[in-house]
Each structure stands twice: as C-alpha cells, then as structure tokens.
C-alpha cells in the first residue's frame, strides 16, 4: 500500500512540473512575438525614411528614359546620344541591318538601368545592334518627340507636295519652327544618318528603309495608348515614305542654312507665317485661269439684272477731276437723285443715259466754293428691258407686215403671211400643195415597155399557153398500169418491177408423238438399260 501511494505522489509531481514547463514556454513565445513585432515596426519606419530620402534624391536626378529633352537654351547634348552615336560611327556603319535588327533585351535593360541611375556605361565592340536599339528606345520613349506633336501635321503636309524644291523650302520652314534644342539634336542625328546612307552598299540601309525603321521614333502623333500610335503610324506610313530621303538628300540645303539657328524675334514667333505655298504646276494653272477670265463689271442696283457692258463703258470715261488737298479742309458733297432713261441701241442692248451731276465742295480757308461737273452713266434700274417700238421692229425685221390698228385683234390674232411674202422670206421652201377639192382622180391604165425603153399604155392580150407534155410509158400497156389515168387521159410513167426476193422455204411442222409411240420409246430405253 505504501509503495502505491509513493507512485501516485511522484506522478502528481511530474504533472505539475510539466505544467510549469508549458507555462514557461508560452511566456517565452509571447516574448519572442513581441520582439518580432517591435522589430518589424522599426524596420518599416526605417524603410519609410529611406524611401523618402530616395525619392528626394531621385527628384534631383533626371530620368533618361521616359523623360524629356533638356531646357530650350541648354548647349550640351544628352550623354546617351553622344555615347551611342560615337559608338555606332566606329562599329555600326558597316554592320548589315543596323537599326532594323534588334539586340538582346537583357543587355538593353541593363544599360537602361545604368543610364537611369547615372552610372558609367561601357559598350563592348560587338554589340552594335544593342546600342542602335537603345538609341531608338530613348528617342521613342521621350514625353514629347523630337519633331513635336504640334508639327506632326506640318511634316505630313510636306510629304504630299510633288515639287521637290517647294517641299525642301517647306521642310526648312517647319524645322525652323521647332524649339532650338530640338533643331540642334535633329541636326546631330541626321548628320550621323547621312553617313549610314553613304555605307548603304554594305549595311543595306537606304533612305527609304530608314524612313520605315527610324522615322517613327522621331515623328509620331499624339495618342493615349500604344495601339493608337501604331494605328496612326501604319496609316501615315505611305505619306511619310519619302520624307526621310528628302531630308537626307537635301541635308546641306536644310541644316547648313545660317538662318536656321538664329534666335527668332517676338514678332516672328507671334506671326503664323507657315502657309503651304502652292506647287509650280498649281500656281501656273491658277494664274492662267485668272488671266483668262473676263473682267467682272460692277454690280447693278438691287433688283436689276447684271449688266456686263458697264465695265467697258465706265473704263472708257475720263476720271473726274480731283480737287487739290488743303490743310484743315471740310468737304460737303451733295448728289441729286439720278434720272435714268432707257433706250435700245443698234445692238439691241439697253444703253446708259448720261447724267450731269454737280458736286459742290466748300472749304473753310477759301471763301468761294468750287463746283465740278462730272458725267456718270448709271445702269438701268428695271431688270426687264422695255418692249421695242414699231420703228425698232421695222429695223430689225423688215419683212414683217405692218401691225393692225385694232388693239383687240392685235392681242388675240397673229399676222398671217401671203405666198409671195413666204417666197421672199424663205426662197428654199417647196411650192404649196393644191387643194383636195380641186383635185380629180384619173383612170389607171396598164403600162408596157417597148424595145426603146419607153413606157406606153397597152391593152391586155390573150396568150395560148402550151399544155404540159407527159413522157411515154416504159413498157407494158395501159391496162397493166395500176395507176388510174388523169383527167386529160394521160398516164403517169410506170415504175420498174421489184427484183425477186430471196426467200427460204418454210420449215416443216414437227409431228406430235402419240401415246403408243411414246410407250414404245420408253420400252426401248428400258431394254437398253437392262442389257
């Protein structure tokens, strides 16, 4: 019994010890968790401070990729442009497919990070395609492209001009409107691209190929997404196909102009002098078209028809005298209302009646007023010309009969012309037809022709037509002919007899055996089998 009680006590003690150990472990774990949470908070605070410091440092450092070009009046070119173009002039001018083939993405991203963090970059001599694609990425990711968004439509408009000289002049104007630093960078890039084109026999990069590959990095429209930019570039690729070639082939004329890099005045900046001049063909055609047009006469008053003869009449008149100019003069002119009379000239046109108009001018220094008389020809105010009189009708139409005196008959009936007047007016008309009442019908007689080809009337004569002859019979009498004779007791010819037909004799009819014969045949067969 004692032994059992001791074991129970030991077990109870062990259980209590285990409980104490578990409590200690829980306490230690809580302490560890508290320490970890405190450490995390400290680390987060430290990271926040570091991020703030890094952001301040990054704000001071300009981003290379995805940024913008330097200030307008800065003289130094970007380092990435200078390093990449210098490298490509040494190792990329004779590499085939330069700017067309892309380099490895990993090396491009490593160089991008170096440029963004403002660290030194060294290119190995065998990475021409990587450096070329790095240069394209820098120009493509600028916030504002080298040829700005505002000038995109201007460059596209230059491409649509067929005359090369006019196109070059317009390109010079458009490039002159770019910001000064953009012009400087553009000249630096195109001087390098001109060397690439000179080695096109080796690198296979012609101006047209460069316009397809390199031009979208410089010239692009303003869009929100990359898909829109691609869509615009594909649509405008046909219009910008020869733009790069026209700039490269005329590099000296465009970029070597001393007026290109001169600072523009405020007036020049305020003026919008970019107006697309017409091409040579269009200009000549328009000038010839304008010169061929007749001069337009001054317009007649409101409600009147346009009179095209007033221009020549007014131009032939002498100009009115001009009074001498006096200092501190005050003039008062009075024009009376014009009196217009219309008449018909020889050419059947309404003429202008001259009207003498007096203008009185009074000047303060001179006590006596000066009067000047000028004659003006005013156009008719009525749009419809007046009806011609009898005299004018007789002059224009001398062959017409005189008008009737009765006004009612004049308005209702029209004058009729006699045969004599018709023959005088229209000599080529045929003679008039006779009246039907006066015409009589004549008997119709037959007409025959003589040997002398003269038509003479003859009487009808009876002619005896001989009967048809029937050939004689070829053999046999009339009795043997099966065909009946005709009404004229004439017989038709007899056909030859048919040849005898080759016929076989008829087959004999087989005899049907009787019952006795059938039994005899059966007996004979049975006897033969038994033997």
Swiss-Prot record:
Region spans: Disordered: 1-60, 266-304, 324-508
Pinpoint the site Arginine finger. Answer: 100
* Residue ranges of coiled coil: 4-51
Start-end of Polar residues biased regions:
446-466, 475-491
List, alphabetically, the Pfam families matched.
RhoGAP
Compositional bias per record (Pro residues), positions renumbered to this chain: 494-508
Q: Where in the cell is it found?
A: Cytoplasm
Residues forming the Rho-GAP domain are 67-255
Biological process annotations from GO: small GTPase-mediated signal transduction
Q: Which UniProt keywords apply?
A: Coiled coil, Cytoplasm, GTPase activation
Where composition is biased (Basic and acidic residues), the residues are 7-50
Q: Which CDD domains match?
A: RhoGAP
Q: Name one GO cellular component term.
A: plasma membrane
Q: Which InterPro entries match?
A: Rho-GAP, Rho_GTPase_activation_prot, RhoGAP_dom
The protein's matches in Gene3D superfamilies, at most eight in alphabetical order, are given as: Rho GTPase activation protein
The annotated regions of Low complexity compositional bias extend over 51-60, 276-304, 324-344, 358-375, 417-427
Could you tell me the superkingdom of the organism this chain comes from? Eukaryota
Q: Which GO terms describe its molecular function?
A: GTPase activator activity
Function of the protein: Rho GTPase-activating protein involved in the signal transduction pathway.
State what protein this is by name. Rho GTPase-activating protein gacQ
The organism encoding this protein is Dictyostelium discoideum
Biological classification of the source: Eukaryota, Amoebozoa, Evosea, Eumycetozoa, Dictyostelia
């Amino acid at each position: 019994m004692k032994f059992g009680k001791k074991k129970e006590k030991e077990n109870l003690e062990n259980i209590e010890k285990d409980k104490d150990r578990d409590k200690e472990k829980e306490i230690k774990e809580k302490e560890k968790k508290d320490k970890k949470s405190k450490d995390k908070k400290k680390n987060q605070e430290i990271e926040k401070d570091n991020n703030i410091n890094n952001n301040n440092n990054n704000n001071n450092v300009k981003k290379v990729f995805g940024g913008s070009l330097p200030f307008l009046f800065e003289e130094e070119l970007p380092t990435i442009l200078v390093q990449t173009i210098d490298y490509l002039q040494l190792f990329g001018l004779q590499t085939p497919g330069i700017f067309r083939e892309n380099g490895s993405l990993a090396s491009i991203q490593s160089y991008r990070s170096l440029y963004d963090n403002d660290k030194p970059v060294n290119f190995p001599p065998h990475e021409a395609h990587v450096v070329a694609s790095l240069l394209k990425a820098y120009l493509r990711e600028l916030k504002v492209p080298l040829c700005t968004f505002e000038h995109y439509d201007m460059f596209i408009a230059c491409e649509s001009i067929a005359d090369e000289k006019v196109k070059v002049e317009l390109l010079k104007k458009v490039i002159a409107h770019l910001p000064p630093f953009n012009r400087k960078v553009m000249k630096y890039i195109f001087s390098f691209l001109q060397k690439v084109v000179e080695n096109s026999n080796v690198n296979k990069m012609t101006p047209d190929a460069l316009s397809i590959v390199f031009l979208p990095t410089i010239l692009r429209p303003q869009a929100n997404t990359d898909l829109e930019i691609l869509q615009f570039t594909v649509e405008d690729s046909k219009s910008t196909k020869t733009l790069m070639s026209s700039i490269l082939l005329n590099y000296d004329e465009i970029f070597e102009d001393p007026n290109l890099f001169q600072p523009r005045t405020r007036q020049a900046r305020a003026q919008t002098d970019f107006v697309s001049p017409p091409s040579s063909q269009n200009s000549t055609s328009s000038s010839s078209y304008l010169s061929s047009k007749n001069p337009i006469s001054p317009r007649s008053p409101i409600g009147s028809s346009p009179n095209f003869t007033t221009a020549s009449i007014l131009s032939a008149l002498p100009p009115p005298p001009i009074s001498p100019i006096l200092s501190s003069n005050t003039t008062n002119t009075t024009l009376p209302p014009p009196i217009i009379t219309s008449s018909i000239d020889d050419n059947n046109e309404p003429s202008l009646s001259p009207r003498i108009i007096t203008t009185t001018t009074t000047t303060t220094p001179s006590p006596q007023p000066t009067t000047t008389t000028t004659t003006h020809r005013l156009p008719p105010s009525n749009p419809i010309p007046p009806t011609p009189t009898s005299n004018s009708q007789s002059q224009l139409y001398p062959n017409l009969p005189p008008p009737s005196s009765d006004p009612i008959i004049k308005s209702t009936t029209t004058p009729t012309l006699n045969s004599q007047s018709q023959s005088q007016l229209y000599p080529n008309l045929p003679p008039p037809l006779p009246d039907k009442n006066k015409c009589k019908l004549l008997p119709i007689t037959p007409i025959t022709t003589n040997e002398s080809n003269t038509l003479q009337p003859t009487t009808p004569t009876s002619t005896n037509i001989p009967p048809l002859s029937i050939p004689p019979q070829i053999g046999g009498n009339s009795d043997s002919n099966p065909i009946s004779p005709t009404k004229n007791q004439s017989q038709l010819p007899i056909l030859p007899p048919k040849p005898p037909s080759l016929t076989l004799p008829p087959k004999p009819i087989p005899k049907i055996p009787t019952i006795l014969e059938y039994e005899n045949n059966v007996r004979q067969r049975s006897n033969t089998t038994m033997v």
